[in-house]
């Protein structure tokens, strides 16, 4: 089967997973959006002959804390660059015994505990699109894209949990033990600081969005386990980053071989029909 020329993959790399060396023939492009500048330059190139655009969520030097990431500009820039899919990576803490440090989780739901972030492109600013967008979030992630990632992970022999609920906290601090225990009671499986509002904005943009979450620790709910700290997170990420990279490098050419017309049209249709325009 020939490759699908309509598919372009945006990759948003989280902690330790934003290496531009995965791209062939790469060039950099600095852009400005109606929402300001993205976290860093867009890095354009190919992965196994598939057009891709890489963006470091926290900047290439990891200088932007989760609250200050310009999620609006990041998603807008990737959409304007022609991306149809967003494959993102994120470090996370595990809230479940069976999700061990180093495991991959293909999250399918989220709980939002952020407090300081704009979650829509339709924010009433003069340079923003008109109207109010009430985007449905019953299924926040693209199920078809998730299925591809799952099949690839299983084929590579990577330990991968097929679904999971991510609770996104504001940060940059980690949770208290009481919070961590509460999130477990709520049904959350993993915890991070970036999934929201990124997934919401991708849904508004009509993109096929899926997240590869890598557990680095057990947060702090396990009383006899060392609580999460930066050193342990970075150590686990360094040891296991190749898992996420392998999934991406294998999945991207497979995605490009598939027919995405109906899926892309469905995402776009939902995005467009969710906007209530002002009456004249």
Swiss-Prot record:
Amino-acid positions noted as binding phosphate in the UniProt annotation, renumbered to this chain: 15, 57-58, 90-91, 194
Family annotation (InterPro entries): MTAP, Nucleoside_phosphorylase_d, Nucleoside_phosphorylase_sf, Purine_phosphorylase-2_CS
Molecular-function GO terms, alphabetical: S-methyl-5-thioadenosine phosphorylase activity
Metabolic or biological pathway, per its Swiss-Prot or TrEMBL entry: Amino-acid biosynthesis; L-methionine biosynthesis via salvage pathway; S-methyl-5-thio-alpha-D-ribose 1-phosphate from S-methyl-5'-thioadenosine (phosphorylase route): step 1/1
Record-marked site positions (Important for substrate specificity): 175, 230
Biological processes annotated in GO: L-methionine salvage from methylthioadenosine; purine ribonucleoside salvage
Subcellular location: Cytoplasm; Nucleus
Main location: cytoplasm
Keyword Transit peptide included in the entry's annotation: no
Catalytic activity: S-methyl-5'-thioadenosine + phosphate = 5-(methylsulfanyl)-alpha-D-ribose 1-phosphate + adenine
EC number(s) stated in the UniProt entry for this protein: 2.4.2.28
One cellular component term from this protein's GO annotations in UniProt: cytosol
Binding site for substrate: 193, 217-219
Subunit note: Homotrimer.
Function: Catalyzes the reversible phosphorylation of S-methyl-5'-thioadenosine (MTA) to adenine and 5-methylthioribose-1-phosphate. Involved in the breakdown of MTA, a major by-product of polyamine biosynthesis. Responsible for the first step in the methionine salvage pathway after MTA has been generated from S-adenosylmethionine. Has broad substrate specificity with 6-aminopurine nucleosides as preferred substrates.
Name of the protein: S-methyl-5'-thioadenosine phosphorylase
């Amino acid at each position: 089967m020939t490759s699908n020329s309509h598919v372009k993959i945006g990759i948003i790399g989280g902690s330790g997973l934003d290496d531009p060396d995965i791209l062939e023939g790469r060039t950099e492009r600095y852009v400005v959006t109606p929402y300001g500048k993205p976290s860093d330059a867009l890095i354009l190139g190919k992965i196994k002959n598939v057009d891709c655009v890489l963006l470091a969520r926290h900047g290439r030097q990891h200088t932007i804390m989760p609250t200050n990431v310009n999620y609006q500009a990041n998603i807008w820039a990737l959409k304007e660059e022609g991306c149809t899919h967003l494959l993102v990576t994120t470090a996370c803490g595990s809230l479940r015994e069976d999700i061990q440090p180093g495991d991959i989780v293909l999250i399918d739901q989220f709980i939002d505990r952020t407090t300081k972030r704009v979650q829509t492109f339709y924010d009433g600013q003069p340079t923003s699109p008109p109207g109010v967008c009430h985007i449905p979030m019953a299924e926040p992630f693209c199920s078809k894209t998730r299925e591809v990632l799952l099949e690839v992970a299983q084929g590579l022999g990577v330990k991968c949990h097929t679904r999971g609920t991510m609770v996104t906290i504001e940060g940059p601090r980690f949770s208290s033990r009481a919070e961590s225990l509460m999130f477990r009671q709520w049904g959350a499986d993993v915890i991070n600081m970036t999934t929201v509002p990124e997934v919401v904005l991708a849904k508004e943009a009509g993109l096929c969005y899926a997240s590869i979450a890598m557990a680095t620790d057990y947060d702090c709910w396990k009383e006899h386990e060392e609580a999460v700290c930066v050193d342990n997170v970075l150590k686990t990420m360094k040891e296991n980053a190749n898992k996420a990279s392998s999934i991406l490098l294998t999945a991207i050419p497979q995605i490009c071989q598939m027919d995405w017309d109906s899926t892309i049209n469905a995402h776009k249709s939902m995005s467009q029909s969710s906007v209530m325009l002002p009456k004249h």
